[in-house]
């Protein structure tokens, strides 16, 4: 999936995460995380973000996440949404997404 524009999903309310993506001039992805629970769960949050990027074959994107205690399922849902918005895709491959739940 190719990200072609900046996009945002989520909120900064309690138990949520706001994720912003923007295309960059690189094949590498960058992740900037701001979280009140970063010391405890920062690695796990980054892992969920990275795994979602890999599943959707996204390269060359800068991800900024402002976490307020979101669960993994919320992070994954916000990532899927923001990436589809950034790629201007209006449909989801539900079978593909469901195959992640092994």
Curated annotation (Swiss-Prot):
Keywords: Cytoplasm, Phosphoprotein. Its main location: cytoplasm. The keyword Phosphoprotein applies. The keyword Lipoprotein does not apply. It comes from the Bacteria. InterPro entries: CitD, Mal_deCO2ase/Cit_lyase_ACP. One of its GO terms (cellular component) is cytoplasm. Transmembrane segments: none annotated. Pfam families: ACP. The modification O-(phosphoribosyl dephospho-coenzyme A)serine is found at residue 14. It is found in: Cytoplasm. Oligomer with a subunit composition of (alpha,beta,gamma)6. Covalent carrier of the coenzyme of citrate lyase. Belongs to the CitD family. This is Citrate lyase acyl carrier protein.
